[in-house]
């Protein structure tokens, strides 16, 4: 906890910022993902994994704590964790994905959010 004195001489305790990024490994099922807005060109899984590794490296470079999940490996779109929850300082709002194939992803994200201390609605 860091204490700062304001210009009026009042001290405030500010908890240190915890920067957490939740990521999910690209699942083997990625090829079957929801892609209604782009064509169905084949996905190069080697390239997808390389791009994901570079993304994780960038997050670590900016000092994010990276939590890597593999709970949704059977969900083709499980890699897109940002679609399942909006996370604020102390609260996460769980999404209700529109595509039936994505609805099962939320439970895995909810469990991880509990592990890192984020209440959710």
Residue ranges of each PLM-predicted region?
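The feature marks the mature, well-folded catalytic cores of soluble enzymes
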Residues: 2-120
């Amino acid at each position: 906890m860091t204490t700062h004195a304001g210009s009026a001489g009042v001290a405030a305790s500010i908890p240190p910022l915890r920067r957490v990024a939740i990521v999910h490994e690209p699942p083997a099922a990625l090829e079957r993902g929801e892609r209604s807005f782009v064509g169905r060109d084949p996905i190069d899984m080697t390239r997808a994994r390389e791009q994901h590794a570079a993304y994780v490296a960038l997050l670590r470079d900016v000092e994010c704590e990276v939590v890597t999940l593999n709970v949704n490996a059977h969900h083709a779109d499980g890699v897109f964790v940002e679609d399942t929850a909006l996370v604020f300082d102390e609260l996460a709002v769980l999404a209700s994905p529109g595509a039936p194939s994505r609805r099962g992803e939320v439970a895995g994200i909810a469990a991880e959010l509990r592990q890192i201390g984020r209440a959710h609605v």
